[in-house]
Amino acid sequence: MKIAVYGKGGIGKSTTSCNISVALARRGQKVLQIGCDPKHDSTFTLTGFLIPTIIDTLQSKDYHYEDIWPEDVIHKGYGGVDCVEAGGPPAGAGCGGYVVGETVKLLKELNAFYEYDIILFDVLGDVVCGGFAAPLNYADYCVIITDNGFDALFAANRITASIREKARTHPLRLAGLVGNRTSKRDLIHKYVEACPMPVIEVLPIIEDIRVSRVKGKTLFEMVGSEPSLNYVCKYYLDIADQILSQPEGIVPKEIPDRELFSLLSDLYLNPIGGGGQKKKNQENLLGFTRI
């Protein structure tokens, strides 16, 4: 099974992806996580350092695939999760989609691409041009990371458009949304009412999730010294269980941008309950912006 994880930049995709990967490994799966971001920090939480990228390795070998061994590009992370970083072209030049294609090509040359039960693509930001939508060409499912905020749901809506487009020629389905570090769900619920799709899980605001990223550790690793965090891991195990159930998934139909703006802004501009509630909702909006 191949899964592509998308979402607004800074929403916590890499942290979420790493914890999902470990959760899947805990369920007995052989997992490979592929970071698809020029920052090449997707797997930092699994390995504790920035591993060499596929592109760096190819360049050092003058693109002679026959001179590259699996251990040159596949690094072992926490919990037995294997890690690969695609890397990216120089800033302002080249195409990220080409890099993803070269990564998959090399893994196939190494007979590694089909050796895993789960391959998880962690894709940069909310860029859904043809280049960075490339992982969708290989994925069975897409998971969108969001929060209860305006911008994150706008990004999610654009990603659904890419899923719909790719699903025309490829058996791709949206598994659902994962809400990350959010105390409320009103905007998420309003969005999925208008654009029907599953909500896999919603994680509350837990500071240790952010701290784990800084420490370069997954929540599962942190539990070793902080057993009180075990309850957080259960969220990721629940996500893993839902993925492993091979959900039917959907091909979503995005909402037109102006319609979505009107839909979400209406909750704040015309709340039920009058001015006091309006002020409270506006304060909540500012709160989500700070997050």
Curated annotation (Swiss-Prot):
It catalyses: chlorophyllide a + oxidized 2[4Fe-4S]-[ferredoxin] + 2 ADP + 2 phosphate = protochlorophyllide a + reduced 2[4Fe-4S]-[ferredoxin] + 2 ATP + 2 H2O. Its EC number is 1.3.7.7. ATP binds at residues 10-15, 39, 180-181. InterPro entries: NifH/chlL_CS, NifH/frxC, P-loop_NTPase, Protochlorophyllide_ATP-bd. The keyword Magnesium applies. Pathway: Porphyrin-containing compound metabolism; chlorophyll biosynthesis (light-independent). GO terms for molecular function: 4 iron, 4 sulfur cluster binding; ATP binding; metal ion binding; oxidoreductase activity, acting on iron-sulfur proteins as donors; oxidoreductase activity, acting on the CH-CH group of donors, iron-sulfur protein as acceptor. One of its GO terms (biological process) is photosynthesis, dark reaction. Its cofactor is [4Fe-4S] cluster. It is found in: Plastid, Chloroplast. Keywords: 4Fe-4S, ATP-binding, Chlorophyll biosynthesis, Chloroplast, Iron, Iron-sulfur, Magnesium, Metal-binding, Nucleotide-binding, Oxidoreductase, Photosynthesis, Plastid. Mg(2+) binds at residue 14. GO terms for cellular component: chloroplast. Gene3D superfamilies: P-loop containing nucleotide triphosphate hydrolases (3.40.50.300). The keyword Iron-sulfur applies. This is Light-independent protochlorophyllide reductase iron-sulfur ATP-binding protein. It comes from Larix decidua. The gene is chlL.
